[in-house]
């Protein structure tokens, strides 16, 4: 009902579609990651992939005319914690811009009572890290606070710093 009755400027599906077009055509981001933080949504990325890529994966418009813009991103993803141990390094520190859609339910259907708060903790930590990054100064302070050898710092810092400002 939200999609069909809400004005475009407040319509979440419309806004997400426009952001996707913006990243694809103006930032050259040819891919988009869908990252659900609930195991019951483990196939959501594949579901969304099929709908988006099949609908938008054409080089012509609805009148059959060739277009001169990118028509859709490559959609992929995994449940959050699976992805954290697979491809998040590329998203945080890689050379490619990978816009990400993080999804988490307010109320989970998972019967493990402490599972959802832990997933939400990871969910918020990842989105914050992508938005704000971690500076050299923060990494150095963390090492000092942990009592680690300052001599090892120079070898480690480049691998712990990430810029943030990732969509």
Swiss-Prot record:
The active site is at residues 54, 85. It comes from the Bacteria. InterPro entries: G6P_Isomerase, SIS_dom_sf, SIS_PGI_2. GO terms for molecular function: carbohydrate derivative binding; glucose-6-phosphate isomerase activity; monosaccharide binding. CDD domains: SIS_PGI_2 (cd05016). Pfam families: PGI. Coiled coil: none annotated. Keywords: Cytoplasm, Gluconeogenesis, Glycolysis, Isomerase. It is found in: Cytoplasm. It catalyses: alpha-D-glucose 6-phosphate = beta-D-fructose 6-phosphate. GO terms for biological process: gluconeogenesis; glucose 6-phosphate metabolic process; glycolytic process. Pathway: Carbohydrate biosynthesis; gluconeogenesis; Carbohydrate degradation; glycolysis; D-glyceraldehyde 3-phosphate and glycerone phosphate from D-glucose: step 2/4. Signal peptide: none annotated. Its main location: cytoplasm. One of its GO terms (cellular component) is cytosol. Catalyzes the reversible isomerization of glucose-6-phosphate to fructose-6-phosphate. Belongs to the GPI family. This is Glucose-6-phosphate isomerase. It comes from Klebsiella oxytoca. The gene is pgi.
């Amino acid at each position: 009902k939200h999609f069909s009755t809400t004005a475009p400027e407040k319509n979440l599906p419309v806004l997400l579609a426009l952001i996707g077009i913006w990243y694809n055509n103006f930032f050259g981001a040819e891919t988009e990651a869908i990252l659900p933080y609930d195991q019951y949504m483990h196939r959501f990325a594949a579901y969304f992939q099929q709908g988006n890529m099949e609908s938008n994966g054409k080089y012509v418009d609805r009148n059959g005319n060739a277009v001169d813009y990118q028509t859709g991103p490559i959609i992929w993803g995994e449940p959050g914690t699976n992805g954290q141990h697979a491809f998040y390094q590329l998203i945080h520190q890689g050379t490619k811009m990978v816009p990400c859609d993080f999804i988490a339910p307010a109320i989970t259907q998972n019967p493990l009572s402490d599972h959802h708060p832990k997933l939400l903790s990871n969910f918020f930590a990842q989105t914050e890290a992508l938005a704000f990054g971690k500076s050299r100064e923060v990494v150095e302070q963390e090492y000092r606070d942990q009592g680690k050898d300052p001599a090892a710092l120079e070898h480690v810092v480049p691998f712990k710093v990430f810029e943030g400002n990732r969509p």
